[in-house]
From Swiss-Prot:
Required for maturation of urease via the functional incorporation of the urease nickel metallocenter. GO terms for molecular function: nickel cation binding. This is Urease accessory protein UreD. Keywords: Chaperone, Cytoplasm, Nickel insertion. It holds the Pfam family UreD. InterPro entries: UreD (IPR002669). GO terms for cellular component: cytoplasm. Its main location: cytoplasm. Belongs to the UreD family. UreD, UreF and UreG form a complex that acts as a GTP-hydrolysis-dependent molecular chaperone, activating the urease apoprotein by helping to assemble the nickel containing metallocenter of UreC. The UreE protein probably delivers the nickel. It is found in: Cytoplasm.
Amino acid sequence: MAKSSWEGNCFLNFFNNKSSSGKDDKTIFKSKFTSPYKLLKCSYDQEGRCILPILHTAGGLVGGDLLEFEANIGINSKVLLTTSSAQKVYGSVGRSKINPEGTFSSQKTKISILDNSHLEYLPQETIVFANGLYSQEFNIKISDNSSFLFTDLIRLGRSSAGESIESGVFRSKLEIMRNGNLCDDWEFVDQIELTKFSFEAKSGMDFKPVFGSLIWICEKEFPITKISYLKEKIKIIFKENNNYLSLGTLENGLSIRFLGTSSQDARKCFFSIWTQIRTVCGFCKPEYQGVWPLQDL
């Protein structure tokens, strides 16, 4: 019997192709992928950063779908990974008489960031429709003198239709480890489960359907004064925003949470914070990507 679910995988290997003359300093990549993954044309900014949008051609996930994504960021590389559209998770609970409790769709992501490299992984939002079941896992390994920026934006249900997650479940697990000379050290661990209960609870989402996380892991020797400056800039962004935001200081980086009713507000907020992170790191100002929603401009 033919399988009705997707099992797709994508493997990306990035490396710096700086020539001996030093004139051509940019990050290039090799890839291997299966449906429903597809890679759009990459582009480069003034720093030679490889900007690669990833497309999910199936239009969404249903129960039983499994996606596996792996990226290796080689030495002296700069990479911006994003997606060309929001990831949609369709309802699974109650759809089958054989399996009425539904089946989780899942995505597993594994990333390795080698010396003096910088990865920005900024996928568009994940929309979990009513009764959708979705699980995602991220396993990140990063060297001492590299950095990692990650955003994760979740919307529960279609608010315009009065829909919430109902009997659905969203689960997320993020593990970031620092590759040491003698042993690996835990840098950051985060586990989240969102259900109808957490959506409605006063101590949870309080009926606000949009939840987002921005995690920034910097180099181990990154100046504390620059982190303090960045925190003050982020607090100014918070004051200009009418949503619920929190800022946490990590051993080497920052953790930011967003809770509100508008995905657009979340994207704009995270873009402003991203701009400030680029500034304190001495990188060029980020540009709005053509695959992102035009209404945010």
